[in-house]
């Protein structure tokens, strides 16, 4: 995953899925705030 935007919601892929990655919590554990109930 890209170390550049991995903090925003890079989501294991390398795509800038900010809203999806952060909200869904599929940010490879690199999300700043893991939302409860995010699959």
UniProtKB/Swiss-Prot annotation:
Tissue specificity, in the record's words, reads: Expressed by the venom gland.
Q: Which GO terms describe its cellular component?
A: extracellular region
User: Which GO molecular function entries does the Swiss-Prot or TrEMBL record give?
Assistant: hormone activity; toxin activity
Q: What is its main location?
A: secreted
Q: Where in the cell is it found?
A: Secreted
Entries under InterPro entries matching the protein: Natr_peptide, Natr_peptide_CS, Natriuretic_peptide_brain
Task: Give the pro-peptide residues.
Answer: 1-8
From its record, what is one biological process in GO terms?
A: vasodilation
What domain of life? Answer: Eukaryota
Keyword check for Secreted: yes
Q: Which UniProt keywords apply?
A: Disulfide bond, Hypotensive agent, Secreted, Toxin, Vasoactive, Vasodilator
Intrachain S-S bonds: 12-28
What is this protein's function?
Snake venom natriuretic peptide that targets both NPR1 and NPR2. Exhibits hypotensive and vasodepressor activities.
Protein family:
Belongs to the natriuretic peptide family.
Mind telling me what this protein is named? Natriuretic peptide CnNP-a
Q: What is the lineage of its organism?
A: Eukaryota, Metazoa, Chordata, Craniata, Vertebrata
């Amino acid at each position: 995953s890209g170390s550049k935007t991995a903090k925003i919601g890079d989501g294991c892929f390398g795509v800038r899925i900010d809203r999806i990655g952060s909200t869904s919590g599929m940010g490879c554990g690199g999300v700043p705030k893991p939302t409860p109930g995010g699959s």
